[in-house]
Amino acid sequence: SMISTKKLFILFFSSFLCATTSSWCKDGLQIKGKLRILKPTTLQVNDLNGTLILSCELQPNKEFATEQKLIQPDIYTLRIGKTEEKIYFENHEVNIIGYYDETNPEQSSLSFKGIDSFLTLQEYLPADKDPDTATVSLPANAQLSPNMVSALAYLANVNDYYSNKKLLDMISDDERNSLSARWLVERVKILSHQIIGAECPDF
């Protein structure tokens, strides 16, 4: 039937892409690795709008590789099976190895290579997990790219106007291209209205 041929073609095409792209281009996000899993599952990377960026079938104890794709360095959702994690990805290879338990994800043990910028961002996240009281501040010597600054704001997700405004001010207008930067622009706008509202209770 028409449907099954279409499906087969897509599966064949995506595995063919997985096999050949690495020789075409050197830049781009590519996720590779080998996971101990009990049954086949899927790896997906989505942007903050939910758009699918990369995906790959995972087979037990077999090496896998997604295609390579040029991306805007930003926060993406990495989904393995039913587990989701927000991670800052850039245009290079990321390696994942370890054990993934789809039934009890908390039993999983995965190790990542190639996410150094994401680990850097973790260092600046507030220890205070309450979004109403937490603040974010960067030391003067912090070496963060504009995309990392907006990614930090997104990951921290605090309600403090001044924290968000300070981070946004570190990103020039022409560098606010990532989805997390657009999110931060909106966030600051909304929080500024709340501040004005709080300062003018008569309105």
Residue ranges of model-derived segments:
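Amphipathic alpha-helical repeat scaffolds of TPR domains
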Residues: 143-154
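Bacterial N-terminal signal peptides that target proteins for export
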Residues: 2-10
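Bacterial N-terminal signal peptides
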Residues: 11-19
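Short solvent-exposed coil/turn linkers within tandem alpha-helical repeat scaffolds
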Residues: 141-145, 173-183
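Short coil/turn linking the two alpha-helices of tandem helical-hairpin repeats
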Residues: 156-159
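N-terminal "domain-start" segment that seeds a small globular fold
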Residues: 186-203
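A non-transmembrane, solvent-exposed segment enriched in polar/low-complexity residues
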Residues: 24-138
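Alpha-helical repeat scaffolds
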Residues: 135, 163-172, 198-203
